[in-house]
Amino acid sequence: MRIGHGYDVHRFAEGDFITLGGVRIAHHHGLLAHSDGDVVLHALSDALLGAAALGDIGKHFPDTDPTFKGADSRVLLRHVVGLIHAKGWKVGNVDNTIVAQAPKMAPHIESMRALIAADLQIELDQVNVKATTTEKLGFTGREEGIAVHSVALLLRA
């Protein structure tokens, strides 16, 4: 059994939506990123890669590679799943914490869970997504960006 932790941050930029956990959410900003900016799936990918001792998403999907410009993070996550399966691991469960003042996440949580479960090839009850604010403190509280912590448990397949 292995445990991995992932953390990612993206700054808000011009735009009218953000993508979190594979779900497109209307917002008065977008997220600045080389790929689609899905900070949930980036943190989750890092947690999975870390648990399997496979490095991080920067190693596998460098932001200097034009191939990944605007990339769909669900495609990247599915690639990560293939890597961990190839090393003899399967996902036991994942837990994701979104840290953001806005937008409200509650209406989107169940959709995120369903997409993540599908991409990880696991059951819905093995995926948790929750959100919190920082009570208007720090960069997330000032609505300058979004942060996500992810934890993943891997089990031998």
Swiss-Prot record:
Binds 1 divalent metal cation per subunit. The record marks 34, 133 as: Transition state stabilizer. Disulfide bonds: none annotated. GO terms for biological process: isopentenyl diphosphate biosynthetic process, methylerythritol 4-phosphate pathway; terpenoid biosynthetic process. InterPro entries: MECDP_synthase, MECDP_synthase_CS, MECDP_synthase_sf. GO terms for molecular function: 2-C-methyl-D-erythritol 2,4-cyclodiphosphate synthase activity; metal ion binding. PROSITE patterns: ISPF. SUPFAM superfamilies: IpsF-like (SSF69765). Keywords: Isoprene biosynthesis, Lyase, Metal-binding. Its cofactor is a divalent metal cation. CDD domains: MECDP_synthase. Its EC number is 4.6.1.12. A divalent metal cation binds at residues 8, 10, 42. Pathway: Isoprenoid biosynthesis; isopentenyl diphosphate biosynthesis via DXP pathway; isopentenyl diphosphate from 1-deoxy-D-xylulose 5-phosphate: step 4/6. 4-CDP-2-C-methyl-D-erythritol 2-phosphate binds at residues 8-10, 34-35, 56-58, 61-65, 100-106, 132-135, 139, 142. It holds the Pfam family YgbB. It catalyses: 4-CDP-2-C-methyl-D-erythritol 2-phosphate = 2-C-methyl-D-erythritol 2,4-cyclic diphosphate + CMP. Homotrimer. Involved in the biosynthesis of isopentenyl diphosphate (IPP) and dimethylallyl diphosphate (DMAPP), two major building blocks of isoprenoid compounds. Catalyzes the conversion of 4-diphosphocytidyl-2-C-methyl-D-erythritol 2-phosphate (CDP-ME2P) to 2-C-methyl-D-erythritol 2,4-cyclodiphosphate (ME-CPP) with a corresponding release of cytidine 5-monophosphate (CMP). PANTHER family: 2-C-METHYL-D-ERYTHRITOL 2,4-CYCLODIPHOSPHATE SYNTHASE, CHLOROPLASTIC. Belongs to the IspF family. This is 2-C-methyl-D-erythritol 2,4-cyclodiphosphate synthase. The gene is ispF.
